[in-house]
A protein has these predicted regions:
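Intrinsically disordered, low-complexity Pro/Gly/Ser/Thr-rich segments with frequent PxxP/GP/PP motifs
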Residues: 115-158, 313-343
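Short, solvent-exposed loop/turn segments enriched in Ser/Thr/Gly
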Residues: 77-85, 159-163, 274-280, 340
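Acidic, serine/threonine- and glycine-rich low-complexity intrinsically disordered segments
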Residues: 148-267, 271
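Short, hydrophobic/aromatic beta-strand segments
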Residues: 83-85, 94-102, 163, 175-181, ...
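Asparagine-centered strand-capping/turn motif at beta-strand->loop junctions
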Residues: 74-82, 87-107, 167-171, 283-288, ...
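C-terminal functional regions that serve as terminal interaction/effector modules
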Residues: 2-13, 17, 284-364
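N-terminal, Lys/Arg-enriched amphipathic/low-complexity engagement segments
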Residues: 4-63
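Short aromatic-acidic-glycine turn motif
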Residues: 105-123, 189-193, 302-312
Length: 364
């Protein structure tokens, strides 16, 4: 288990109103993000066939290498074990490619357990900290026009499989552009070779669970300036819509519309930004005449929340925060005189609810 990062302490608070929205946001890391979380529950209704593709990322690129992150989150309620895995099909006639630098965290847990912590928080912390396990894919050799298997796992009935894989696709030979497909595949038979599943993805279920394939995996969010000693501020991140007017918030970047069109229709908004890194820049103005300590908290605004935060090179687990009366102080920052910026990165645990409040106060 690679998610041994220390856990911060939860507390209580009454968050200040009104909220301020994120000022602006733009994509950060160009590592691709594929999110496979719909259908989340695999049963006779959502997964009627013997096997199928849960989601895919279709890639065409002139680059010499492409970096990927794939997050999956599926619950087996089929009444029998399921085989779930990750494959890559090279569809190019002009080159061979190779899957390298694979790191992954896979959690298979009873779906009736505390999956927010046992799977979601663990995936977020290990990915954000860079402590996922190295993995030698099942097919490490160069792939021509064929399907390679990265890994397959058995998921018992009544269990969740949550995973994050990071890897790099490199050109092994040839000089033509990349054309390949990454798939999450599943089969009711343990004897099925998941390499043979090359169908289009299952239809999205009626639940609001997200899925999609985006050419980036990080949000760079700028929140409005905080003034030391002034009114306590609560900023609202990871929201579905703005508080007033209903227009999309600035940080809603992982939408069905921004999902790579090569992967076709069927994407669903990733409002909570599961699998993505959410990097916050907080401008702080200190005109008090002396350095001042500022406290930064996170506070759930849509239901139960957990995750991880990176401060510099250190990563901490954010504990389960059940209600909007719960909070976790993630940092104490000594603001110098004048204008400075405090930066930190968040990753939301699978099964969390958003929006998330970022609460800023001056230490008394």
């Amino acid at each position: 288990m690679t998610c041994k990062q220390p856990e911060l302490t939860a507390g209580k608070m009454d968050a200040a109103y009104p909220f301020q929205e994120v000022a602006s946001a733009e994509p950060g890391s160009r590592r691709r993000l594929m999110l496979s979380d719909n259908p989340e529950v695999l049963d006779t209704g959502s997964f009627p066939e013997a096997g199928g593709t849960l989601w895919h990322d279709v890639v065409q690129s002139d680059a010499d290498q492409v970096k990927h992150r794939v997050m999956g989150w599926h619950i087996n309620q089929t009444g029998q074990p399921l085989q779930v895995g990750l494959t890559l099909e090279n569809q190019s006639e002009a080159n061979t490619l190779q899957i390298r630098q694979i790191k992954r965290e896979v959690r298979i847990v009873d779906a009736s357990s505390n999956i927010l912590v046992d799977a979601g928080q663990c995936l977020a912390a290990s990915c954000l900290a860079g402590t996922m396990d190295d993995h030698a894919g099942a097919d490490c050799r160069p792939l021509a026009q064929e399907v390679g298997l990265i890994e397959a796992r058995e998921v018992p009935h009544g269990h969740l499989i949550g995973f994050i894989y990071e890897f790099t696709v490199c050109r092994s030979s040839g000089d033509g552009p990349f054309h390949y497909v990454v798939r999450t595949a599943a089969s009711r038979s343990a004897d099925t070779d998941l390499r043979t599943i090359v169908s289009e993805p299952l239809s999205a279920a009626g639940q609001p669970h997200p899925r999609g394939s985006w050419p980036f995996s990080e949000t760079l969010a700028l929140i409005p300036e905080y003034e030391v000693g002034g009114t306590t501020h609560n900023y609202r991140a990871l929201a579905k819509s703005r508080q007033f007017g209903g227009s999309p918030p600035a940080d809603l970047l992982f939408t069905a519309g921004s999902s790579d069109p090569l992967s076709g229709g069927g994407a669903v908004n990733n409002t909570a930004q599961f699998g993505a890194i959410y990097t916050v820049s907080l401008p702080i103005r200190n005109e008090t005449g002396a350095p001042a300590k500022v406290h930064i908290w996170v506070n759930p605004r849509g239901g139960k929340y957990a995750g991880a935060v990176r401060l510099g090179k250190e990563v901490f687990r954010i504990p389960v925060l059940p209600t909007n009366k719960d909070a976790c102080r993630i940092a104490e920052y000594e603001a110098p005189e004048g204008l400075s910026t405090f930066t930190f990165s968040l990753m939301t645990a699978g099964e969390s609810n958003t929006p998330l409040g970022i609460f800023v106060t001056t230490s008394s």
